[in-house]
Design a protein with these regions (language model features):
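ER/Golgi luminal nucleotide-sugar-dependent glycosyltransferases, focusing on the catalytic module
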Residues: 1-227
Length: 227
């Protein structure tokens, strides 16, 4: 189909169980030369609002090249609409769904290596909304700056983290942390941002999803909830 694997060129493909889509992000950073770059998923794409469960109708709602070009004439970065946690903060949601110590260690690393971002980290952690999924479109020059910052923090966190006791889900640690870090990085940038819908090509049982999140938040009952 013409796809290039992320195990070519300069890569961290072997880290995929822990870094998730970030192995593709790293590959693009190190191997591509282009004006603009973005990240979507095989089942999650930027697009127009669509209410149908029909997969073909969902596919037709996915942004075209023209849609992206029109937005990028007015904005510096395209982002997914924020997820609203409503009843808790970004920090408490992470602590309920994942391991608190990993977020705490990330905060320490930022204070040590990028103290100018500490206030942004605190602000994002105290908010109730978050851009998730690591999805975006921006200029490659801006993307390079983001990746330099992001992977410096994540590689340091990896050095300080023993993953031997982590189950498969929690071993995706660096993917989860990166979603929060992306918002921290954005908080420090003075960018013209555009939030757009995400087209989910799979059918999600939203009532069940909401119930699961409520159980985690209200009763501290663990579920396998991404992000």
């Amino acid at each position: 189909m013409g796809y290039i694997s992320d195990n070519t060129g300069y890569n961290i493909s072997d880290k995929n169980p822990n870094y998730c889509e970030l192995t593709a992000l790293y590959w693009a950073w190190k191997n591509l030369e282009c004006e603009y770059i973005g990240l979507c998923h095989y089942r999650r794409c930027f697009g127009h609002t669509v209410y149908s469960k029909d997969v073909e109708k969902k596919k037709s709602a996915i942004f075209s090249k023209v849609d992206y070009e029109n937005l990028l004439t007015k904005y510096e970065v395209i982002l997914p609409k924020t997820r609203n946690y409503y009843i808790e903060t970004v920090r408490s949601q992470y602590e309920h769904a994942h391991f608190k110590k990993d977020l705490d260690e990330t905060e320490k690393i930022i204070a040590e290596k990028y103290p100018g971002y500490s206030d942004a980290f605190t602000k994002v952690m105290n908010q109730r909304k978050l851009h998730i999924l690591n999805m975006f479109v921006m200029k490659k020059s801006l993307f390079d700056k983001y990746c330099t910052w992001l992977f410096d923090i994540l590689f340091e966190l990896e050095k300080r983290t023993d993953l031997t006791s982590y189950e498969t889900y929690e071993a995706r640690l660096f993917g989860f942390i990166s979603e929060r870090l992306f918002n921290v990085w954005l908080e420090r940038q003075n960018l013209k941002k555009c939030e757009v819908p995400v087209v989910f090509l799979e059918n999600i049982d939203w009532p069940k999803r909401v119930c699961q999140e409520f159980c985690v938040n209200r009763f501290n009952k663990q579920h396998r909830i991404a992000a």
